[in-house]
Each structure stands twice: as structure tokens, then as C-alpha cells.
UniProtKB/Swiss-Prot annotation:
Similarity comment text for this entry: Belongs to the venom protein 11 family. 01 (wap-1) subfamily.
Function: Has antibacterial activity.
Domain WAP, chain residue ranges per copy: 21-66
GO cellular component terms, A-Z: extracellular region
Residues spanning the signal sequence: 1-20
Entry protein name: U14-lycotoxin-Ls1a
Disulfides per UniProt: 24-54, 32-58, 41-53, 42-80, 47-62
Compartment(s): Secreted
Organism, scientific name: Lycosa singoriensis
Alphabetically ordered keywords of this record: Antibiotic, Antimicrobial, Disulfide bond, Secreted, Signal, Toxin
One of the record's GO molecular function terms: toxin activity
PTM summary: Contains 5 disulfide bonds.
Amino acid sequence: MNSKVFAALLLLALSTCVLSEKYCPTPRNTSCKKMNIRNNCCRDSDCTSNAFCCAEPCGNFCHKASDKPGGRRVDPNASCQTGYVYW
């Protein structure tokens, strides 16, 4: 295979991967009272319809993926339990 064709195909494949990356949406709330913190998920596999488990000030919630960065996915290795979080 011609090296120029190979390089072009490789560049196309890499750009497709980068452009198709999905993120958690920006959280709506920027603060939360401690008594209202609830985790609906602890990892992406807790969510349905290929949603992401996203960390927010009031806990972890499942959200549809966004094309724009702004939110933060939950670390699947972090200690987490679903339900209300009591301090």
C-alpha cells in the first residue's frame, strides 16, 4: 500500500475517534446542601441507554452523552454506593 494513502487513512481514523468522543454535560447546579446528596449511579454500567454516570454537586446521575466537555464522569474505581449519602 502506498505510504501516502496509508497515512491519509490513519489520519482519517484518528480524527474520527477524536470527533466522536462524548462527555458528561455541564452540571445544572453548582452547589448542593449536604443533606440532598444522592448517587443514582456509581459507574456507567448502572445507567441505561448508553448514558454516562456523571459526578455533580448533588451526587452522581445518569446523563445522555454531550458533544461538548463540561461535566465529569464518575471514576469507576472510586468508593461509591447508590442512594443518599450521609456524612
